[in-house]
């Protein structure tokens, strides 16, 4: 392999988020991300710098990091994700207070539509999509999110994971 000191590559990443509040505490949220990376000259791209997409924080309804290029592992009989040098992710989420919760804004329901994928050297822009529902709670320990995602465009090799849990921020 190539010693780490000889690896030369670049990464470009951008993210855009927009939130719009409506009456009665309803919020429409958008998240968009793109990333691209490439090695210089004849140097190989370090696979440890690959992007991964799938799961909460990217495309819910799929297992974390499972989308994009894969290889078939003959030892386990499963497809393993390899990540990719480019990624695209888009999330649209509509959040409402839980009916009957009154002034308590810590518990909220949301619906979402997600799309995205990662790519190797060939970018073909085939996206995976999902939609679903979830519950978020601003707990004393921080934000918690539970979501149930349903893939729209999945392949037999995709690792589907419908129920997911997240600790942390909105996207």
Regions found by a protein language model. Give the residues of each.
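C-terminal outer-membrane beta-barrel translocator/porin domains of Gram-negative envelope proteins
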Residues: 1-102, 106, 119-121, 157, ...
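Residue-level signature of outer-membrane beta-barrel architecture
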Residues: 18-20, 94-96, 137-139, 150, ...
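Short Gly/Pro-enriched loop/turn and capping motifs at secondary-structure junctions
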Residues: 99, 116-120, 142, 152-153
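Flexible, small/polar- and glycine-enriched "cap/hinge" segments at structural transition points
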Residues: 106-109, 114-116, 139, 170
